[in-house]
Amino acid sequence: VSDKNKNGLDAGTIAGIDSIGVEASTDIEKALSTEADCVNYTPLASLRLGEDPDLDKKNIIMLLRKGFNVVTTVGFLYPKAFGEDFANEIEDACIEGGVSLHGTGIAPGWLSDLMPLTMSGMSEEINEVVVTESSEFSYYPSEEIVFDTMLMGKSLDQYNQEAGRYENWLGGLFKEAIYLIADGIGSKIINVDESIDLITAEQDYKIAAGVVEKGKISGQRRKWTGNCE
């Protein structure tokens, strides 16, 4: 765990269930001293939050080299999207440890990539693949996700000042899905275009995570387009 307040607690207690006899630790070396075949690596993404944007990559490569299979939701769905050097570094770590890496999620990870590839198997010719996702966060109770990570409730000026890492991280996730689909249907990506529309609140809104004040960001509409040869 990354939260020092959870250090030493039973993992079941943290999850809100009965104790399961597994101690949570902020010491990664201590955690890895146990015998395990696979590590479920699911922190808040370091590309978005924290002092070191590369921390997740460093940790995952370390785990792979030590011989742990890794399942993660921080990205790494299709490392090839970030270039051959990036993909080769991941592959070399897997080979060294004799293990595998599985990046997954709902979207990306299933709905925005695996489903289109599965459904496209029934098509003789594909001219365009369109995937639309709509997410409702007014019922999501996490301030850290809604306000800190997604920058909801910020002014437009605040967003423009703080959004660099957020947009790089989020764009990277969906670019992985785009490259995965393109390779899956036998196309080659020339470039990926990105656009964003920010919607501001017409009045104060009370949501599960707090309050979005009038004039602050209450919605985001994003679009990524992979242009193929």
Regions from the language model: what does each represent?
Residues 34, 55-58, 85, 89, ...:
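Conserved active-site and cofactor/substrate-binding residues in soluble primary-metabolism enzymes
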Residues 3-4, 44-45, 68, 74-78, ...:
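Short, ordered loop/turn segments at secondary-structure junctions
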Residues 48-69, 73-100:
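Rossmann-fold NAD(P)-binding glycine/threonine-rich loop
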Residues 13-18, 88-91, 119-122, 146-149:
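Short, hinge-like loop/turn segments at secondary-structure boundaries
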Residues 120-229:
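Active-site-lining helix/loop region of Rossmann-like oxidoreductase modules
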Residues 78-141:
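A contiguous active-site-proximal alpha/beta segment in oxidoreductase catalytic domains
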